[in-house]
Amino acid sequence: MAVDMFAVLADPTRRQVVELLGARPYRAGELSQAVGVSSPAMSRHLRVLLEAGVVTDERTPHDARLRMFRLRPESLAGLQAWLDQIQAHWNEQLGSFKRHVERSLDG
């Protein structure tokens, strides 16, 4: 089953987590504090992101009970490619409209 990245990233808390993880790895507790949600809520958000392949987790070497979460930027490549297509389409449409208006004003 394909992952609906829009559904995964529709939640503002998950988008904030993705932004934070884009800077560096975090433990779940650090993310809870940074975002301002409870630990159980953060666990649910991280589960969604893990299942979608947006983040990975690994045990820390010094304490196997702690997990570090990292962003998988490549997981967002499909979304980025789609957004690039949409942007190119609208750039073309707006350029065409601009040329039409300029011709109308000159004529």
Locate predicted features.
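A cross-family signal for key residues in well-ordered alpha-helices
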Residues: 7, 19, 50, 80, ...
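DNA major-groove recognition helix of helix-turn-helix
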Residues: 46
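Amphipathic alpha-helical dimerization/coiled-coil segments
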Residues: 1, 74-107
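Intrinsically disordered, low-complexity regions enriched for glutamine and histidine
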Residues: 12-14, 25, 43, 85, ...
